[in-house]
């Protein structure tokens, strides 16, 4: 803090010193001149002292002002250090967060690549399925369609065929011995009648025998048909 006493001027009690105030015929002229010169010197010294005191006071006032300014600067620097420390902490936290995000992004990129591979595989499977569906739509047998349907390939069933819920064709029957002789696939009159007299003539018996042969051949033809269709063996 500035010393206010430095601002107080030096007061010279004797403000005027010349030959008129000195006793006459006591001192020599040279001494009188010396005394007068001393008074002048004392005044000059007092002036310089006052200037020096004022300068010292002004310097102390300036120092006090600078001390206040330096204290403000120190406080601001301290706050800046606190802010910098806070920023460093936040930067460190952000760096860690960025590192974690990088890891997550890398993981996500790997998962995306895997998903892209899976999607490509699924695209291939979907394309194949679409082609299969198109093929099925162009060539399939419907359970609900009422129009005539056909198959180009053999059809295999485990038990039997039914029409209206009634069995019409079952599994092959085995144990049949194949008939021999000639099969009759020609004209066959199921209503043919025979004349029979009381004495059974030769011609009547021959007609019945011929009809029996025709029937047997017809039976052979039917058996051949059943075998051809795989119904008996």
From Swiss-Prot:
Trimerization heptad repeat repeats lie at residues 61-67, 70-76, 77-83, 84-90, 91-97, 98-104, 105-111, 112-118, 119-125, 126-132, 133-139. Residues 175-233 are annotated as: Inverted coiled coil. Keywords: Coiled coil, Late protein, Pore-mediated penetration of viral genome into host cell, Repeat, Viral genome ejection through host cell envelope, Viral penetration into host cytoplasm, Viral short tail ejection system, Viral tail protein, Virion, Virus entry into host cell. The keyword GTP-binding does not apply. Residues 2-60 are annotated as: Interaction with tail hub protein gp10. Gene3D superfamilies: 1.20.5.340, 6.10.140.940. One of its GO terms (cellular component) is virus tail. Cell-perforating component and plug protein of the phage tail machine. Together with gp4 and gp10, gp26 is required for stabilization of the condensed DNA within the capsid by plugging the hole through which the DNA enters. Host cell membrane perforation allows viral DNA ejection. The needle penetrates the host outer membrane. The needle is released and the internal head protein gp7 is ejected to form an extra-cellular channel. the N-terminus forms the domain that binds to the tail hub protein gp10 and plugs the portal vertex channel, the middle coiled-coil rod, and finally a C-terminus distal tip that is a tight trimer of alpha-helical hairpins. Homotrimer. The trimer forms an elongated coiled-coil (240A x 25A). The N-terminal tip may exist in a pre-ejection extended conformation, which may fold into a trimer of hairpins only after ejection into the host. Interacts (via N-terminus) with the tail hub gp10. Interacts with the head-to-tail adapter protein gp4. Belongs to the Lederbergvirus tail needle protein family. This is Tail needle protein gp26. It comes from Salmonella phage P22.
């Amino acid at each position: 803090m500035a010393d206010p006493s430095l601002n107080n001027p030096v007061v010279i009690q004797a403000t005027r010193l010349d030959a008129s105030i000195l006793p006459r015929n006591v001192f020599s002229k040279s001494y009188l001149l010396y005394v007068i010169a001393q008074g002048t010197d004392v005044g000059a010294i007092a002036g310089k002292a006052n200037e020096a005191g004022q300068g010292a006071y002004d310097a102390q006032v300036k120092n006090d002002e600078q001390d206040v300014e330096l204290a403000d600067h120190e406080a601001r620097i301290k706050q800046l250090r606190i802010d910098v420390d806070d920023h460093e902490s936040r930067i460190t936290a952000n760096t860690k967060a960025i590192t974690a995000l990088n890891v997550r992004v890398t993981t996500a990129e790997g998962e995306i690549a895997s998903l892209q591979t899976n999607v490509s595989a699924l695209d291939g499977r979907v394309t194949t399925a679409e082609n299969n569906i198109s093929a099925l739509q162009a060539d399939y047998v419907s359970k609900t369609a009422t129009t005539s349907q056909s198959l180009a390939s053999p059809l295999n069933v485990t038990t039997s065929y039914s029409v209206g819920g009634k069995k019409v064709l079952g599994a092959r029957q085995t144990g049949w011995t194949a008939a021999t002789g000639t099969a009759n696939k020609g004209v066959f009159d199921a209503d043919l009648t025979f004349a029979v007299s009381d004495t059974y003539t030769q011609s009547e018996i021959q007609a019945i025998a011929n009809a029996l042969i025709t029937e047997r051949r017809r039976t052979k033809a039917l058996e051949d048909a059943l075998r051809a269709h795989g119904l008996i063996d």
